[in-house]
């Protein structure tokens, strides 16, 4: 139980989720406390701005029914810390780290600051071990790497929630003696989405190795900004203290940024691009940069954040700034979704900057780089030929061009498309890749090494294609 260091009855204003306290002395940025209104109900607060004789604090429990007159604020002289424990695995929490599953918190093994432990850049270890998600488009083309931060850029109405649940359920680390855990963070999600995730995790058994932090759209905006940090604090404890490889799935970071904008507006700050605060890049970096591996530590923290691009605009400040910080992006395509392809990846717009160092012999399979490079190059050429066919007609194309059209169809329908409950290993993904590539003549596969093509090319597939 924390003991108040100082109390103030000088609340000047309640403005949205914020309160302004006058005549303060010695109050620090990030310090926690509580505000008690005339009803006697305590609500946790955190200082987000300090002036010469005033402080601004965000009320984590919301300010509904809280008047300025008659309210008392008590500060504790400490920053916000949450109890952490290995027994949190299998639990569902809210955005403040409190139970949402109607069970008591387990005995804490430690208390950790929600702002995390800064990793010395010199101690960081380069990520080069893959995580198998069971989704061919990710594992085959843009492999997720332990310690990486790889976001999904989605749009309203696209199946990013299904993908988040599938990744939580299927992801694993092969050939590792350390444990593997998933921390799922729902930020500003609707009640029906929260019910979907909770039901899905329980039904499939994914919750047995996961911690779920669910912040609802109806929860206070201050909690929305806190939720990713709570999830990452739990992930860091599991990784750095207990040696787990932790995959952190966060959805939806757009809701986080909207909450950040709302808090900034409430503080009267000068807005930046499209009304978002000018420090949004720095703020996002404090979240994304908590991913990584460190020398001398067994565990790792991998981030898989999901955001919805407003109006499908990839130049919007949220995806734009996210792309600067993270190591690539996976873009979902509305056109692919319209054709009934799940997961609807935009292969050409997607990128994983670290994938090349986490695949190949001894990690996945010797032909992995060849398959990935050749599939992307061939599909890019096939899309150009598909556009040409709409102008001149398929019958006026040569036989090689028609093979590229067959390849593009097979690539989308057999390689990219897979069932929601279908899990593919690296080997299965690469085998499907060769089945699709073998539709093309062998001399077209110039992005693969000759010895690899000779070993894996399926001539019987080539001969069976009807033009």
Curated annotation (Swiss-Prot):
Q: Which GO terms describe its cellular component?
A: plasma membrane
Q: What is its main location?
A: membrane
Q: Does the keyword Transport apply?
A: yes
GO MF, one term, reads: proton-transporting ATPase activity, rotational mechanism
> What InterPro entries does the record point to?
ATP-synt_VA_C, ATPase_F1/V1/A1_a/bsu_N, ATPase_F1/V1/A1_a/bsu_nucl-bd, P-loop_NTPase, V-ATPase_su_B/beta
Region of interest called Disordered, as start-end residue ranges on this chain: 95-114
What GO terms describe the biological role, i.e. biological process, of this protein?
proton motive force-driven plasma membrane ATP synthesis
What is stated as this protein's family in its record?
A: Belongs to the ATPase alpha/beta chains family.
Write down what this protein is called. Answer: A-type ATP synthase subunit B
Species in which this protein is naturally found = Pyrobaculum arsenaticum (strain DSM 13514 / JCM 11321 / PZ6)
Organism lineage string: Archaea, Thermoproteota, Thermoprotei, Thermoproteales, Thermoproteaceae
